[in-house]
Amino acid sequence: MKTKLKIGDSVKILSGKDRGRIGKIASINRKKNKVIVESCNMVKKVIKARTPQEKGRIIDKEAAIDISNVMIFVKGTSSRLGIRFENNEKIRYLKKNGQRI
């Protein structure tokens, strides 16, 4: 699935336990259609001890969210993204109000 989202974009989460939260995209997996949003969809991960002296621990880590469950969020407005060409330059814009990104 093709996406117009980029790393660093602010997005609003549309479904799941963090529904309504806003965060920035940390990474995008285009093959699996997943994004990782900073400080959203946190899960606990158990790290085993590598040596007998070291202790195992539990850390909080961001889990991937499906691309269909996030929407671009700019200046209080969440909208779908569109692409148009202006002066032979590709421009991303919000479909709701035509605002350039």
Curated annotation (Swiss-Prot):
Tree of life domain: Bacteria
Entry GO MF terms: rRNA binding; structural constituent of ribosome
Keyword RNA-binding: yes
SMART domains documented for this protein: KOW
Pfam families: KOW, ribosomal_L24
Keywords assigned by UniProt, alphabetized: Ribonucleoprotein, Ribosomal protein, RNA-binding, rRNA-binding
SUPFAM superfamilies: Translation proteins SH3-like domain
A GO CC term assigned to this protein in UniProt: ribonucleoprotein complex
Family, as annotated: Belongs to the universal ribosomal protein uL24 family.
Subunit structure: Part of the 50S ribosomal subunit.
Function: One of two assembly initiator proteins, it binds directly to the 5'-end of the 23S rRNA, where it nucleates assembly of the 50S subunit.
Name of protein: Large ribosomal subunit protein uL24
Organism whose genome encodes this protein: Borreliella burgdorferi (strain ATCC 35210 / DSM 4680 / CIP 102532 / B31)
Gene that this sequence comes from: rplX
